[in-house]
Amino acid sequence: MTRIAGVNVPVKKCIPFGLTYIYGIGISTANIICHACGIDKSKRVSELRDKDIEKINSFIRQNYSIEGDLRKEVAMNIKSLVEMGCYRGVRHRKGLPVRGQRTHTNAKTRKGKSRLPIAGKE
């Protein structure tokens, strides 16, 4: 396992697919990183030299928020929506879909089990 941006990346994967193991980097962002660093996309992670790994690390650090910072940022954004009391915040608080999806027949996973009390049981 090669360590890039504090994440263990599998050595047998192609570089763009290996970079997607980092939270906040998808396949299109990984392709942009490879192009910006001048690294061939068809190479495997195991074929990277230390110089290439350092180049990727510095590019990611300068241009993207990833891992813990990104998770904190997303959590703070959701928290501010909930505190504002806007529609999206209310949906987050109730555990319902936020982006306008249908809930009458779908969204079973998001809604969870119904918590209605059963008559005669306490």
UniProtKB/Swiss-Prot annotation:
CC terms in the record's Gene Ontology section: cytosol; small ribosomal subunit
Subunit structure: Part of the 30S ribosomal subunit. Forms a loose heterodimer with protein S19. Forms two bridges to the 50S subunit in the 70S ribosome.
Organism of this sequence: Wolbachia sp. subsp. Brugia malayi (strain TRS)
Record-linked InterPro entries: Rbsml_uS13_C (IPR027437), Ribosomal_uS13 (IPR001892), Ribosomal_uS13-like_H2TH (IPR010979), Ribosomal_uS13_bac-type (IPR019980), Ribosomal_uS13_CS (IPR018269)
Its biological purpose: Located at the top of the head of the 30S subunit, it contacts several helices of the 16S rRNA. In the 70S ribosome it contacts the 23S rRNA (bridge B1a) and protein L5 of the 50S subunit (bridge B1b), connecting the 2 subunits; these bridges are implicated in subunit movement. Contacts the tRNAs in the A and P-sites.
HAMAP family (UniProt xref): Ribosomal_uS13 (MF_01315)
Protein name as annotated: Small ribosomal subunit protein uS13
GO molecular function, one term: tRNA binding
GO biological process, one term: translation
Residue ranges, annotated region (Disordered): 97-122
Biased composition (Basic residues): 97-114
Highest taxon of the lineage: Bacteria
Entry's transmembrane regions: none
Annotated PANTHER family: 30S RIBOSOMAL PROTEIN S13/40S RIBOSOMAL PROTEIN S18, SMALL RIBOSOMAL SUBUNIT PROTEIN US13M
Keywords in alphabetical order: Ribonucleoprotein, Ribosomal protein, RNA-binding, rRNA-binding, tRNA-binding
Family: Belongs to the universal ribosomal protein uS13 family.
